[in-house]
Amino acid sequence: MGSSNSKRQQQGLLKLWRGLRGKPGADWVLLSDPLIGQSSTVQEECGKALKKSWGKGKMTPDGRRLQEGDTFDEWDDDEEEVGFPVQPRVPLRQMTYKLAVDFSHFLKSKGGLDGIYYSERREKILNLYALNEWGIIDDWQAYSPGPGIRYPRVFGFCFKLVPVDLHEEARNCERHCLMHPAQMGEDPDGIDHGEVLVWKFDPKLAVEYRPDMFKDMHEHAKR
């Protein structure tokens, strides 16, 4: 039997996985479900816990606290709202090199980010997950300006933003183009370069130090 901490971690992972893939066509490539390889019991328990545990301590969009028996799904009618526990589960800390490397490889091993289209909403989801599950203060996620590949400003974070071409389906299907998350994303530097970006894992980012890029990373992230 798994411990309560293990079950809580699975719930957090599933929340992140579903949040990042909240709309059809989120993936640039097909990624694995974070619960693949887990026992069917754990998968079933995580599924049941989603409706129960996520509602505890939550507020509805109109400011009403969820009561016992309510589910967050009943009130989560705004796709742009991102819901997580009110308070972080662990002590707060700033991002460090070691923490960035560990966090990157954790995300990579769980299939939570690699190959996902970038959008402002997904960036917020990742920040909230890092804050609530890892205690990482959300001043860390920033990237070099475009056009082209955007490199992380935090030394040790192994995910960069890479421009990609849309799938043939996305280019030719009018309905798919209108609804595709790639069409609704925004450049992280706030400039429209007409590029579609995806997160890509690059372990070399943990060893290739470029002082000009990583200088004053926290100050840059706050701007």
Curated annotation (Swiss-Prot):
InterPro entries: HIV-1_Nef_core_sf, HIV_Nef. It is a lipid-anchor. GO terms for cellular component: host cell plasma membrane; membrane. Transmembrane segments: none annotated. The gene is nef. The N-terminal domain is composed of the N-myristoyl glycine and of a cluster of positively charged amino acids. It is required for inner plasma membrane targeting of Nef. Residues 73-81 are annotated as: Acidic. This is Protein Nef. A lipid is attached at residue 2 (N-myristoyl glycine).
